[in-house]
Amino acid sequence: MAGFRNHLKREERKEKRKDILMKRIRPDRCRGASDSRLPSPIPARVYRTLDEEVKRRYHPIPPRYEHLPAFCLFLYAVAAVCLILLIIQSGSVAFSDWFNLHISAPLRAFLAALTAPLPFSLGEFTVLLLPLVLVVTLRHAIRRRCDSWRTAGVFIGVLISVLLSFFSVFVLNFSAGYRNSTLDVKLELEQKQVSAEDLADTARILVRHLNEEAGKLGFERDGFSVMPYSLAEMNDRLSDAYAAFCSSHDFIRNNAGQPKPVLVSEILSYMHITGVYSFFTGEANINVNFPDYTTPYTAAHEMAHQRGIAREDEANMVAFLVCIGSNDSYIRYSAYLNMYEYVANALYSADANRYRTIHAELNSATRGELSAYNRFYEKYRDSAASKVSDAVNNTYLHTQQVSHGTRSYGMVVDLTVAWYKAYPEK
C-alpha cells in the first residue's frame, strides 16, 4: 500500500506541474483551426503527456533550446584557458614578450589579412549594427526561445558565451602588449626625469625639422597644409615605412593591415577620438574629419596597435619613428608637427617663456596651421560626448595596468626626449 500511495503522490505532483505550466501559457497565444498564428510553444516533456486534441494547440520547444549548444561550451572552455593566459601575462613580462611575438602576432596578421579586402570597416559596422542586433535577438528570444526559466537561462548562457568570445580574442590578440617589456627597454633608451631644458632642446630639434619639411608642402588659404595624395596612397607609403621599421627591429612583426576611414568621423570628433584599433576584426580605423596633417600620424599610431604595440605612449612613439623614417615629406611633417604639439604643451607648462621663444622660431606656415587647428577644434572642445568617451577610455586603460590612464598618451614626451638624447642627429 505504501508503494501505491507514493505512486499516487508522484502522479499528483506531475499533474500539478502540468497545470502550472499550462496556466503560464497565455490563452491568446493558442490557436484554433481557423487561426493563422503559430501554436504556443511548450516544453517537450509536457507536450508528450498531452492528449492529441490538446496537442493541436501547442508545439514542443526544440530540445536545442533547453540545453547549451556544444559550441557555446567550447567558447566557455576557451575563455577559461584565456583567463589563465591573462593571469600568466600579468605575472610574467618575459612570457608576455614571447606571447605577443609568437602567438598574438600571427593571429593579428590573420585577422588583418581577412578583413583587408573589405572596402569598409567591419569593426565600425559591427558597432553600428549592435543595437539593432540586440533588439532583434531579444525580440526573437521573448517570442520564440524563452518559454520557461530553463530556456531563458540557456539563452542568457548563449549571450554570455558570445561576450566571452570577445574576451578570448582580446587576450589572444592584444592583451600581452600591455604587459610585455616597455618600449624604452626595447629601444635601449635611458629615461630620466625630464627638465624644462630637456624639453626645450627637444622642441628646437622638432622645430628645425618642421622648418625643413614645411618648405616642400602646399598650404590652403584656411591655413591648413594639404596632403598631396589619396588615403590609399598614404596607406601604401606608411606600409613601406612600417616594412622598413619592422625589418630593423625584432620586437615588432609587420602585417598587411592598412587603416580604413570611419564613416561616422564627425561623431568621433565630438568624442575626441582620432582613431581606434578594432582588435576583434584586426582593423585600424581613422577619423578623416580632422585636418590632413593629423591623418598620417594617426594612421601610423593605429597601425602600431595593429602590430602589437598596445600602450598609447608607445604607439605614439613607434608611429613617430616610423613616420620620420619615411621617404615622404608630408608623412615626416605630420610626425614632427604632432610630436611638437606634445612637447610644446609640456614645455609651456614647465617654462612658458622658453616655449614662446622656441615657438617664434617655427615657420609662419606651420604656426598658421596650428592656429587654424585651434579654430577647427573649438566646436568639439567641451562636448559632453568627449567627457563620456574619455571616462570610458580611462577606465579601460586602468584595467590594462596603464596606471596613468588617458594621460599616458602624453607620456610619449618622455620617450621622445630620451630618443633625442640618445640620437640627437636624427
Model-assigned labels for residue ranges:
Residues 80-141:
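Membrane-embedded alpha-helical segments of integral membrane proteins
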Residues 136, 153-182:
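Transmembrane alpha-helices and immediately adjacent membrane-cytoplasm interface residues
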Residues 297-309, 316, 320:
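Active-site recognition of the HExxH zinc-binding catalytic motif
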